[in-house]
Amino acid sequence: MKQEENGESGFGRLRGGARRAVRVSTQALVVTDSLEPGRTFPLVLRPAIEGLDLAAWAAANREEVERRLLEHGAILFRGFDVRAPAQFERFARSISPELLDYRERAAPRKEVGRGVYTSTEYPADQPIPLHHEMSYSHNWPTKLWFYCDQPAGWGGRTPVACDRAVWNLIDPRIKERFIEKKVMYVRNYGEGVDLPWQEVFQTEDRALVEEYCRRSRAEFEWRGADRLRTRQLRQAVATHPRTGDTVWFNHAHMFHVSNLDPLVRNSLLAEFKEDELPRNAFYGDGTRIETSVLDEIRRVYREASFAFDWQRGDVLMLDNFLASHGREPYAGPRKILVAMAELYTNAECNRED
């Protein structure tokens, strides 16, 4: 382990005793570590003293946490006494007081606290590919936190990837094509296969859905009694607002029909046209994205990824520009919670008039 090298002030709390402020160096409170020798992504922070209050320490050392996050892209807080969703929420708010609601959903989640949700409630036997949270939307969270309330009995690891590495691994010709054309997402709600529009937009009022679409520059079309189609032209890459890093930032490989299990894909294509599928991705001009190109993106993510086993009480903090995340299949109960903060607005996709 390597000791934290700079900073002062923090707060310690001994188990069984009253909380008290302690003026000590950060070195004495937290040490840096790694999940394997030589690996700095994600950075691992552990308490150097028993009973350290993570939320209080983070509040007192917020600038240092922010600096580390921008440097590494991901921080795993391990060994701290975080044992309940309320403690997790308190820690997240110590960094970003205003947590975000989950709107324009792509997956089912349940809210378990103010701004705290279950992670994607997707079938346990299916993997979730690496992705940036809400990169299909007109705005997205800058910061993410994942909290392990209960690790899976088997599997359920979370792969993460440093997107500085991902960007460097992608063929320049693919980058150029996507930068020029961008990505068009087509979603069809009300087919009984994917999420209903009422859950995605968190309302049953059509007028509110239409207003949301107009403001986010998304085309919409009501089809029949309770069906909705949206088309959204979105970015393929993004630039970090603080570091200036350019990163691959889209959901094309996840929304595209090639991401489906072959049996499911063939069944859907036998019933629907490609633009009538529950979700699909095209180039921004409406032309098909080559499956071979998306397979290359998936290969790059696999090459850049690193998966770790959860321990109860772990908190993983991600910069949503600099790190992507996924989920491996699992068996048995598993409870991972998520919080999001600091909304980034894509000016090209937001209408103020």
Regions found by a protein language model. Give the residues of each.
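Polymerase palm active-site segment centered on the conserved acidic dipeptide of motif C
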Residues: 98-107, 306-309, 315
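Short cationic amphipathic helices and targeting signals
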Residues: 74-79
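An N-terminal structural lobe/cap that precedes and organizes the functional/catalytic core
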Residues: 67, 81-82
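Glycine-rich loop at the start of a catalytic domain that most often binds anionic cofactors/ligands
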Residues: 82-97
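Long, mid-chain structured domain cores
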Residues: 135-137
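Short glycine-rich, polar/acidic loop-and-turn segments at beta strand-coil junctions
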Residues: 49, 80-81
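Active-site environment of non-heme Fe oxygenases that use a 2-His-1-carboxylate facial triad
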Residues: 2-57, 64, 68-71, 124-130, ...
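A gly/proline- and charged-residue-enriched helix-loop-helix capping module
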Residues: 100-132
